[in-house]
Amino acid sequence: MDLGIAGKRAVVCASSKGLGLGCAEALAAAGVHLVMNARGAEALDASAEAIRAAYGVEVTTVAADVTTQTGQAALIEAAGEADILVNNAGGPPPGMWTDWDREDFMAALDANMLTPIALIKALVPGMMERKWGRVVNITSQSVKAPIAVLGLSNAARTGLTGYVAGTSRQVAGSGVTMNNLLPGIHATDRANALDGGVVKAQGITLDEARARRAATIPAGRYGTREEFGAACAFLCSQHAGFIVGQNILLDGGATLATI
């Protein structure tokens, strides 16, 4: 399927690896020029060069922490007249409710709520003026069904979801769509970290931890960055103009919900 977005310009946050990289690769395959961001320059530059070689698109890199004002300013400057924004950030660490204080919550809110909102406020007005734009926020399946040990993530990502629910309806009339992708377990560093915690807590091997988690997923496996990226690219396409303010689960059926 031709997604109809060749020549567009996309900002993809946290895109040196994992789900962000999957989104960047899928957009590049559709002919979209990229502004890629991550904190570490080495991995970011390597991923960007691989995408340039594979797809022949323009790729600008911004190695910066976008939870800071300096990092946000650098990314916004590089974005130019961006048509697409993919918000993404690593989740806060797991723990128990007794572990977290105000500083922990503020760090989670900065990364998983306030930074995406800042980038939306900076880039969406230009999209509205040009009468076309796409915003995809990568959140979590915990928005639909909270995960007890991920209380910081539950809170911050649900806050972003509430913001998007209202804002998406305000900008849709200008040709800008805004939606959220809610990943379940995918084969990423984040999954490795969570599985590693199970290994330590239960005294089992990593393979056993992964097998047990996969058994809780009706699809019987972890998701891949490639299939996640394909879903993101479709939401950014010309074909997705009537999808507004939605929370789309990509979890292999793991979340038990009717709606």
Features from the language model and the residues they span:
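Substrate-binding pocket helix/loop in short-chain dehydrogenase/reductase
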Residues: 96-109, 135, 213-214
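Conserved glycine-rich Rossmann-like NAD(P)H-binding loop of the short-chain dehydrogenase/reductase
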Residues: 32-46
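Catalytic loop of short-chain dehydrogenase/reductase
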Residues: 136-159, 164-173, 185-186
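Alpha-helical segment proximal to the catalytic Tyr-Lys
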Residues: 125, 169-170, 241
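Conserved glycine-rich cofactor-binding loop
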Residues: 9, 14-18
